[in-house]
C-alpha cells in the first residue's frame, strides 16, 4: 500500500493524528488548499490538546477535511513568520509545513471554548480581486498592533460547498478563526484578507464571526478584468485568441464546468450573453460587486474602499479607514511609502504584469454587459459607504 493511501485511511479515524510531510507537491497559486498538497508519511496518534498547549505559535489551521470531519493544521518550525514568508498565507503554510495534524471537529470545538472568544478586533477584507487588497493588508500593518493574513484558504473552501453545508460548518469556522488568532495575533488586531470569491460567503462569515467588521475593496471594472487576464494567460496568447475569434465564443462554451458558476454566479443568467475571457471576468467582477452591495444593504459593511482613492490619497484614505474600524494606531509615513513603492504580490505568480491587453472593442463589450444590470451598470460605479471625502 502506498504511503498516501495509508495516510488517507488514517484521516478517516476519530482521533487526532500527526503526519510527517515527505514531499510538497507543486500547486498553481489559484489552487485551493487541501491535504492532497502533500505526500504524507505514516501517522502517529497524538494528544493535540497537549501539543497545542506546549507551542500554539507553530500551529495554524490549513483547511477543512469534510470526509473525515476534521480540521487540518500545519506545523512549522519555531520562529517562522507565515505572514511574511510569501505574499499569500496559504502558500507560506504549504512551503513551510513540516507536519500535518488532523484534528476531529468535536475536539476542535471543545478546545475552542478555552480560547479567547472576543472577535471585536477582527477585520474581514473582501474584494473583487486584482484591486489592491493585498496592498491594503500591507498598509494596515502600519497601523500599530496589527497582524494581517493574506488569503487563509480555510475560508475559500466555503464557496465550493452548497450554502446549507457552509452554514452548518459555521461553528467550526468560528473555532478555526479563534485558533488562527491565538496562534498569530495574540491580543492585538488581526485582519484577514480573503480571496475575492469569498465575498459570496460574506454574510455567512459575519454570522459565524459576530463582532468582526467587514470591508469591501474594489476597482474600475476594466482594470480588474485586464489584470485578471494578464495573470491567467500570457498577453500574446490572449491577443492571438482575440485575433482568431475565440473571444467571440460564449463563455459557457469555453468554461462549461459548474465551478465556473461558483466563481461568477451571474453567468447563470443567459441574458448577459458573456463571451470569452473578457465576458467571464466581467461577470465575476459584477457578481462580487452585487454580493457586496447586498451585504452592505442587508448586514452592513464597516466601509467600502476604491483602489483609485487609496492610490490618490493613501494617507488620508487609511486614516478614514482606521476611524471607520476603530483602530488606534498611528500612521507611519515611511512604512506607507515603502509599501506603495512595490508590487504587493511580488514573489508570486499572481504579481501584476503591468501590461494592457484590453482594446477599445473589449471595453465596449464589458460596458454592454454591465449595462444589463439595474444598478451596477457602469465600470466606475461607486458603492455606498465609501471613504472618499
What do the PLM-derived regions correspond to, one by one?
Residues 1-113, 256-304, 309-389:
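PAPS-dependent sulfotransferases, especially Golgi type II membrane carbohydrate sulfotransferases
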Residues 82, 121, 128, 138-199, ...:
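PAPS-dependent sulfation machinery
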Residues 90-148, 152-154:
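Long, mid-chain structured domain cores
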Residues 123, 213-216, 303-305:
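Hydrophobic/aromatic beta-strand patches that form the interior of the parallel beta-sheet core
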Residues 130-131, 153-155, 196-199, 220-224, ...:
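Short, solvent-exposed loop/turn segments at secondary-structure junctions
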Residues 135, 200-206, 225-229, 314-318:
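A short acidic (Asp/Glu
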Residues 148-150, 212-219, 238, 330:
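Short hydrophobic/aromatic-enriched beta-strand-loop microsegments
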Residues 208-230, 321:
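Conserved phosphate-donor/acceptor-positioning beta-strand/loop module used by diverse small-molecule
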